[in-house]
């Protein structure tokens, strides 16, 4: 933890620098960042699981306590208004005593609706950052999530501090242990539900602590890109396993995918080819490279796989140009990663929020940035047998280029995705996922 504390000092200094710059530019007194409030289920007395505002948890790892506030201006010591009610029904969070607390002036809030007493006396020139705009209006904020401030913060959030990079390494390290446990469970005959339980046990995190709903897909379920059903019964025949699952560390996410074949066969060979292609794409990452160019290169590699494995005929570039590869690889190559799984800033050209749209032929690409040092991105090429997309090819002449017999052979396996989390450095790439032990 001392290593992390050392980096945290510089992290807070950088966040203060960013705030000082944007509030000066926008003639604001400062920012008031709301952790959020509980959301009550309809006609019930139970709340949905609480998720802290990512702008709040960028400053400190308070992840599960609603009704907290940060008051920052980039000059004075940041103030943390920490919610600690008198409550015999629920567990009350302890007053924080960690390495980061020395960087904050901490005030305790016992009643959520009394926060105005602890906020700056004249709030009119402070900007509110958070979800609950109705609360901000009642409190007197006239500036609520201003575009100029949000665009500035989102643009710079793509450049990670050393503290953030270390948190993400640890999130990867935790997730790798879960992936190894899940792989072992698959080969030992576990159901989707049982694999999920073994994953969560290995990472030591619950359903609401991991950064997103895990995808645990056996056989043809792997063709459903965001499959989260978790069947309790095993399939009649065990063919394949796709796992897309991450872990959290101090609010930062990992996002890792692997695909396995139960036996040595054509599908297993296709996984090997995809793994090789993915590593080649990662080798192409460097500062100055346009991420959309990497995505287009992925389509070229998918096209070659379609030819090599007799899924399609023709030439590779023609398969890309006709949109045939998009039927087999319909999603983007990856995205920014950080406080959020699909982290902000992936389309930002500059601090003003100038939008770089995805290519018209690839609307699901989640990042169009030019790569720069200290960015963290996922690299997740895939190839799937998705009938709804392949049926579109049957409607025109493109269907004549598809070897439907091979498609039928591979359909029960669902699909393949391989995803690593990569830090772009000035002179190298750091593949956290591989370097921390997941082949």
UniProtKB/Swiss-Prot annotation:
Task: Write the record's keywords in alphabetical order, separated by commas.
Answer: Dipeptidase, Hydrolase, Manganese, Metal-binding, Metalloprotease, Protease
Detail which positions bind Mn(2+) 1.
255, 335, 380, 419
Top enzyme class, one word, equals hydrolase
One GO term describing the cellular component: cytosol
- Which residues are noted in the entry as Mn(2+) 2-binding? 244, 255, 419
The EC number on file is: 3.4.13.9
Out of the domains of life, which is the source? Bacteria
Supply the PANTHER family for this chain. Answer: XAA-PRO AMINOPEPTIDASE 3, XAA-PRO DIPEPTIDASE
Q: What is the protein name for this chain?
A: Xaa-Pro dipeptidase
């Amino acid at each position: 933890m001392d290593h992390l504390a050392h980096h945290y000092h510089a992290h807070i200094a950088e966040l203060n620098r960013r705030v000082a710059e944007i509030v000066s530019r926008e003639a604001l007194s400062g920012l008031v960042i709301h952790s959020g409030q509980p959301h009550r289920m309809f006609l019930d007395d139970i709340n949905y699981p609480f998720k802290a505002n990512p702008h709040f948890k960028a400053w400190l790892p308070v992840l599960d306590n609603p009704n907290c506030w940060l008051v920052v201006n980039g000059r004075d010591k940041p103030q943390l208004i920490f919610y600690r009610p008198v409550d015999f029904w629920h567990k009350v969070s302890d007053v924080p005593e960690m390495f980061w607390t020395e960087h904050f002036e901490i005030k305790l809030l016992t009643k959520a609706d009394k926060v105005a007493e602890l906020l700056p006396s004249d709030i009119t020139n402070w900007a509110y950052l958070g979800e609950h705009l109705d609360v901000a209006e009642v409190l007197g904020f006239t500036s609520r999530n201003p575009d100029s401030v949000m665009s500035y913060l989102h643009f710079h959030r793509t450049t990670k501090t050393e503290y953030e990079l270390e948190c993400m390494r640890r999130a990867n390290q935790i997730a790798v242990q879960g992936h190894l446990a899940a792989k072992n469970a698959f080969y030992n005959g576990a159901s989707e539900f049982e694999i999920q339980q073994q994953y969560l046990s290995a990472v030591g995190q619950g359903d609401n602590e991991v950064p997103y709903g895990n995808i645990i897909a056996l056989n043809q379920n792997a063709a459903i890109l965001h499959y989260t059903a978790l069947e309790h019964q095993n399939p009649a025949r065990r063919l394949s396993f796709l796992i897309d699952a991450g872990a959290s560390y101090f609010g930062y996410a990992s996002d890792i995918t692997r695909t396995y074949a139960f036996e040595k066969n054509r599908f297993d060979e296709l996984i090997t080819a995809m793994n090789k292609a993915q590593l080649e794409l990662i080798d192409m990452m460097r500062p100055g490279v346009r991420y959309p160019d990497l995505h287009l290169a992925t389509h070229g590699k998918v096209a070659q796989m379609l030819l090599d494995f007799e899924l399609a005929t023709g030439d590779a570039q023609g398969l890309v140009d006709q949109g045939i590869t998009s039927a087999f690889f319909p999603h983007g190559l990856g995205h920014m990663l950080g406080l959020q799984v699909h982290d902000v800033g992936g389309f930002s050209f500059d601090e003003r929020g100038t939008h770089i749209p995805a290519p018209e032929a690839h609307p699901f690409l989640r990042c169009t940035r030019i790569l720069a040092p200290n960015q963290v991105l996922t690299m997740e090429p895939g190839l799937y047998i998705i009938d709804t997309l392949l049926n579109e090819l049957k409607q025109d002449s493109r269907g004549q280029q598809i070897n439907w017999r091979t498609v039928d052979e591979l359909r029960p396996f669902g699909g393949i995705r391989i995803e690593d989390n990569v830090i772009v450095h000035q002179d190298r790439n750091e593949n956290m996922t591989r370097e921390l032990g997941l082949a």
